[in-house]
């Protein structure tokens, strides 16, 4: 009887240990190209992941915690040029996000909170700041096209145009 209990406890420990381990997963498209790869723990995406377009080009990369995006993420177009990058917290976009045009130049920087614009959004044209808007919980509350008035209103005398 004692031996059976020890054996059962040992078996349960082995099962628990096996299911709590991180395993590396790869999923493929029908054409054989890699679709996604990353770490699974307790049947959830946990850790660093990469996603690919069907042509094999990197689509996005970043971290998960319990199936939710977290930390810093990068997104790319099918031609490998960066599309956007920014922070996730519990699956929602937060902090500064940078958006790139099709040549890889920043055309938009925006502060987000829980997937909504919250703070400043800066619009660039040919790498030059042209417009600024201020948002609160996704709603635009003010916009500046005259950067001198924006700098004055916000005490930003050192901001480069």
Please give the residue ranges for each predicted region.
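Bacterial Sec-dependent N-terminal signal peptides
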Residues: 1-24
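Glycine/tyrosine- and acidic-biased, solvent-exposed loop/turn segments at the edges of beta-strands
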Residues: 16-161
């Amino acid at each position: 009887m004692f031996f059976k209990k020890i054996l059962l406890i040992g078996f349960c420990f082995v099962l628990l240990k096996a299911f709590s381990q991180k395993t590396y997963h790869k999923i493929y498209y029908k054409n054989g190209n890699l679709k996604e790869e990353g770490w699974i723990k307790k049947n959830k995406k946990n850790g660093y992941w990469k996603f690919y377009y069907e042509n094999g080009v990197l689509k996005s990369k970043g971290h998960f915690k319990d199936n939710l995006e977290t930390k810093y993420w990068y997104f790319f177009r099918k031609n490998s040029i960066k599309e956007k990058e920014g922070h996730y917290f519990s699956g929602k976009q937060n902090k500064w996000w940078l958006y790139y045009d099709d040549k890889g130049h920043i055309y938009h920087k925006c502060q987000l909170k829980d997937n909504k614009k919250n703070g400043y959004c800066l619009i660039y044209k040919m790498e030059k700041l042209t417009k600024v808007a201020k948002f609160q919980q996704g709603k635009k509350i003010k916009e500046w096209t005259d950067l001198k008035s924006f700098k004055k209103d916000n005490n930003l005398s050192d901001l480069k145009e």
